[in-house]
């Protein structure tokens, strides 16, 4: 299939106009490779192990959630040079769907809600609120990642969930207005924890967003490449 036809399909899945302003210039086809696409790989991040795995399976396209070119590039050296060299030598296209896939039907947050078996759901401006039947240990097992809590959440209960860095006070307040008794996201800061009107559940960024890319790959018949960071909790 021609890359142009594939891009049309991708834009139907995650319409570019649903992306937030911060993603201007950071989504879509950010690295061009071959025109003829016979195999598609999918991952959360563009890392060297991911690119090597995509090249080994002779994928023509890598669909990811996070761009490897977030900040303006003023020099191509070190790890970035090594990454781009691997991508270009594999003639690999890289396509990014970020906040447009966060907001999309069947996207990052829908996949997270499905994984946690949320029911009676309501959409927030970003994320989903719903009744969660799982206990804290069960949530940690579903996510395959450590779970840290602030406050005293009592699960099962109604929770708000936002994949990625979602601990913004307006989002937490929005979840509370929808009846949430706890809030799950990643990358919590001290001031956010102190200001929150709800008990908070923190997992890793990867654990909350990779299910969406994995489910997308399964739906589309792509190869999902798993490359989780190594995490541990010491007490």
Question: What positions do the PLM features span?
Answer:
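Active-site catalytic microenvironments in core metabolic enzymes, especially phosphate/sugar-handling
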Residues: 1-235
